[in-house]
Amino acid sequence: MSQSICSTGLRWLWLVVVVLIIDLGSKYLILQNFALGDTVPLFPSLNLHYARNYGAAFSFLADSGGWQRWFFAGIAIGISVILAVMMYRSKATQKLNNIAYALIIGGALGNLFDRLWHGFVVDMIDFYVGDWHFATFNLADTAICVGAALIVLEGFLPSKAKKQ
């Protein structure tokens, strides 16, 4: 039995496109205006810093000889497909879940594009306190983390709020 896409969670796929445009646009600006390793202070504790990540979060498996590029690409594709199916099976009114899934898909596809096109992920956000620097990350990573946090938040909401 088929149903209208607008009645399913796929109605929220526009958010995937927004995340992709913002993420890929920011990476394009970095690639066009920064040399690898360049840093520009934005605010106290926040820099723009061009870095390349050949691995995953925190450069996990970055020095593994290249196979990790395809491994992480496969994971991104798999997760995106699974979440799209979950969106299709959910109602459009289940906003929190669908927004979370769309953010994760958008972030995963943004980093997937980098892996396939460049062979690495472009990172540029450098958060620091004093001499301690958090791992450099990008807007796709931020979308993935916000999406994951929304899924966790949804788990704590009362049943009535989950349906909306």
Curated annotation (Swiss-Prot):
Q: Which UniProt keywords apply?
A: Aspartyl protease, Cell inner membrane, Cell membrane, Hydrolase, Membrane, Protease, Transmembrane, Transmembrane helix
Question: So, what pathway does this thing act in?
Answer: Protein modification; lipoprotein biosynthesis (signal peptide cleavage)
Enzyme active site: 123, 141
Q: Which InterPro entries match?
A: Peptidase_A8
Instruction: Kindly list the biological process annotations in GO that this record carries.
Output: proteolysis
Q: What residue ranges are annotated as transmembrane?
A: 12-32, 70-90, 102-122, 137-157
Q: What does this protein do?
A: This protein specifically catalyzes the removal of signal peptides from prolipoproteins.
Family indicated by similarity:
Belongs to the peptidase A8 family.
Q: What is this protein called?
A: Lipoprotein signal peptidase
